[in-house]
Amino acid sequence: MDTTLPPPQHMEREPLKSKSSLLPMTRRGNGSKGQKILLLTNHFRVNFRKPNSHNFFHYSVTITYEDGSPLLAKGFGRKILEKVQQTCQADLGCKHFAYDGDKNLYTVGPLPRSSLDFSVVLETAPSRRNADKRLKLPHQSKKFNVAILFAPPEIPMEAIANALQGKKTKHLLDAIRVMDCILSQNAARQGCLLVRQSFFHNDAKYFANIGEGVDCCKGFHSSFRTTQGGLSLNIDVSTAMIVKPGPVVDFLIANQGVNDPFSINWKKAKNTLKNLRVKVLPSNQEYKITGLSGLHCKDQTFTWKKRNQNREFEEVEITVSDYFTRIREIELRYSGGLPCINVGKPNRPTYFPIELCELVSLQRYTKALTKFQRSNLIKESRQNPQQRIGVLTRALKTSNYNDDPMLQECGVRIGSDFTQVEGRVLPTPKLKAGKEQDIYPINGSWNFKNKPATVTRWAVVNFSARCDPQKIIDDLTRCGKMKGINVDSPYHVVFEENPQFKDATGSVRVDKMFQHLQSILGEVPPKFLLCILEKKNSDVYEKSCSMWNCECIVPPQNLNDQYLTNLLLKINAKLGGLNSVLDMELSGTMPLVMRVPTIIIGMDVSHGSPGQSDHIPSIAAVVSSREWPLISKYRACVRTQSPKVEMIDSLFKPVSDKDDQGIMRELLLDFHSSSGKKPNHIIIFRDGVSESQFNQVLNIELDQMMQINHHTKFFQTESPNNVLPGTIIDSNICHQHNNDFYLCAHAGKIGTTRPTHYHVLYDEIGFDTDQLQELVHSLSYVYQRSTTAISLVAPICYAHLAAAQMATAMKFEDMSETSSSHGGITTAGAVPVPPMPKLNTNVASSMFFC
């Protein structure tokens, strides 16, 4: 057999000039398979009275202090422009405007002049000399200069009308951006927190405590969409995590789960509090936290300028505690033994006792949520379809968009009814267990029972002294017998860790365990290891994953059958088995995939947790099918890349004229070696990119992609339940030109089903619409960790898992803590991008990510 695989001719990279002409493909027609069904969707019809008679005018905005220095504080631009609107109506020609909070302002029609300058005074404005004064007086005033300058070209509103009529227009995205800016301005006037196109009211009735000092704030997303059915307003429920407002000390106690302020981990607290805003009692003046003092309040000194008997200033060293208790006559109950809050600059700190500081409302919490918080968030976010319909109806009414002055100037009126669309429920794909037993899923799920599978040549290694490994083995064997799975006895029963190494590093502990295994088993290693760990995120995990094909578990106290069944599913997949396959894989009923060598690829880039993505490398994970004609078995290739880079930069990595060390070559070689053939067809699913990146991805990665991060929902017209699994929509609210569709492959048992939005960017294989939709639907049934259909295709889920597992193994989350600190301000240094550790050959070719 030919073991080499030169890059196919058609995969050679073309010059940028020829690739830059690629655009997303147009729709080839709608699908017809499946039972038709009428649905409602959370899109509301938008009517234009005179779309051809107006242009949007774009102006750049510059805000400076009175001395010409720029305004740097975020969030105050809107207040300043609101003041301009209130006090300078005549100069503005009585025109309304939409301001994006930064440097862009839009009007319907022109302002009286192309260049306008204003001076306004704002009460309680942010001081640019935040650290120049020790104390702020309440109700301080600041004068600002505002320059508004016309920034051509004009944006014709008819671009939207032209797009809806099927005409090409280069101003469509600009016009929609202005319309969305008007929606944001509407929310800003109500004092909402704005997060892209979502807004959140400062009202306690929208807050729900999810534990550890964090609230879930319920808000709404609103945006305009051009669809086959016309322009629509998409409204949906959104959720943001916010810091629980109130005393800083109370927040830290809750966040760290301690009983009193003297048990707080202040190193961790410093990272948590950075950049949060506080109001300081009794003045209620707001500041941004830059750090903590290095000493306790009773020991931290600063230089205070006081008047002597001659009315002259003299400098005196005084502690923060003494200053507030003796000079300001403010009683401090417990701050003396705690650090101070620093709101100053590195070279000139400004300290306040912590008990005088309260966190203000509507501040986003950007740290990773704990398991406890995630569990509570799911409970608080649940809304069945009828509840969501009611909430969205009230949200549209409360927003009162039809009375918005700018929307009125645009001639826009928004309907109050959910849009009715036609969908189809696709036939459920038939599955096979082994080669004989047929499985017919019901409502997107099936039983895992009497499925021919065997767990053999495995071993148990125990790194924990807190559990009974023999009980785990017995329960796993018992559960396997109930499900028809033969679980052989493991090697040597259990390999226990030598207690003398329990305090060693994870690398040493795993090496010693490996030597222990070799001394007993010789050169014939087990195919699979069940590693019992003492805790999650153990440093044993990293080395175990790179050396062994293993499943690392922290056993719960109650080993129920559901836990054991899920464990068996994962073990069987890691051992190279398949819990079920599509009938079409064995029968070849999809000729374009099953009768022509076809590789299916899933791509995703995983970034750090919110608030940490700037400091830790991103992980690109690509999975590919193997052993064609199977499309249920995959392997993964995972690489690191620079933080927040969405495009995968190592798909191709030529090191010479004849050698390439990129991801694609590695996966194509694996397909060739496992299938005995080179692929004629390549089908690629790409997750994690927005519509604005389609052209970039198309010309760099050339793929088919999906989007989970959208806000369209569907509701049955004659039932309060979720839509049926297999429901597909490819008309009305879909793109007016491009080839896209929505698919609800899974059965939504909790809350409201969220469909996956698929965009087909490029197709030279020649799928007809029904064939492609059937393939995508079927790929939601091949996820080996589950006995239910999942919401998106399995290759993408596997890419997510592979990236997450390797990120955990490399402990990237810990890298965000390694930053330099100076004067209370933490700054991240250059982010290193360490290479991914090389996996053992047997591990790399397995479904280790399951």
Curated annotation (Swiss-Prot):
Domain of life: Eukaryota
Pfam annotation, one family: ArgoN
Keyword set includes RNA-binding: yes
GO molecular function: RNA binding
SMART domains, per database record: DUF1785, Piwi
Piwi domain: residues covered: 518-811
Matches recorded under SUPFAM superfamilies: PAZ domain (SSF101690), Ribonuclease H-like (SSF53098)
Stretches the record annotates as Disordered: 1-30
Gene3D superfamilies: 3.40.50.2300, paz domain (2.170.260.10), Ribonuclease H-like superfamily/Ribonuclease H (3.30.420.10)
GO cellular component terms given for this protein: ribonucleoprotein complex
One GO-annotated biological process of the protein: defense response to virus
UniProt keywords, alphabetically: Repressor, Ribonucleoprotein, RNA-binding, RNA-mediated gene silencing, Transcription, Transcription regulation, Translation regulation
Every PAZ domain range: 247-361
Stored InterPro entries: ArgoL1 (IPR014811), ArgoL2 (IPR032472), Argonaute_N (IPR032474), PAZ_dom (IPR003100), PAZ_dom_sf (IPR036085), Piwi (IPR003165), Piwi_ago-like (IPR045246), RNaseH-like_sf (IPR012337)
Function: Involved in RNA-mediated post-transcriptional gene silencing (PTGS). Main component of the RNA-induced silencing complex (RISC) that binds to a short guide RNA such as a microRNA (miRNA) or small interfering RNA (siRNA). RISC uses the mature miRNA or siRNA as a guide for slicer-directed cleavage of homologous mRNAs to repress gene expression.
Family: Belongs to the argonaute family. Ago subfamily.
Protein name: Protein argonaute 8
Species this protein is from: Arabidopsis thaliana
Lineage, opening ranks: Eukaryota, Viridiplantae, Streptophyta, Embryophyta, Tracheophyta
Gene name of the encoded protein: AGO8
